[in-house]
Amino acid sequence: MSDIEQRVKKIVAEQLGVAEADIKIESSFVDDLGADSLDTVELVMALEDEFEMEIPDEQAEKITTVQQAIDYAKAHVKAA
């Protein structure tokens, strides 16, 4: 598991109140993990903070699974 994947799963677990062990990369935030629209907004904000990046609203709407969040972070995270 990559560092980014681990960090995304940790954020998802904290934001949605689910166990990290229950989070699969194909998990949908809404359908599988029980997120509502407010949860998804808070999740995007937490991802922005964690990875020091900005996710435009039109992109945020497309991030609906753990894998999509990981892929977005990998593509947009600032190189250390």
Curated annotation (Swiss-Prot):
Gene3D superfamilies: ACP-like. The keyword Cytoplasm applies. Residues 2-77 form the Carrier domain. Keywords: Cytoplasm, Fatty acid biosynthesis, Fatty acid metabolism, Lipid biosynthesis, Lipid metabolism, Phosphopantetheine, Phosphoprotein. One of its GO terms (molecular function) is acyl binding. This is Acyl carrier protein. 4'-phosphopantetheine is transferred from CoA to a specific serine of apo-ACP by AcpS. This modification is essential for activity because fatty acids are bound in thioester linkage to the sulfhydryl of the prosthetic group. Pathway: Lipid metabolism; fatty acid biosynthesis. The gene is acpP. It is found in: Cytoplasm. It comes from the Bacteria. GO terms for biological process: lipid A biosynthetic process. The modification O-(pantetheine 4'-phosphoryl)serine is found at residue 37. The lineage of its organism: Bacteria, Pseudomonadati, Pseudomonadota, Betaproteobacteria, Burkholderiales. One of its GO terms (cellular component) is membrane. It holds the Pfam family PP-binding. Belongs to the acyl carrier protein (ACP) family. Carrier of the growing fatty acid chain in fatty acid biosynthesis. It comes from Herminiimonas arsenicoxydans.
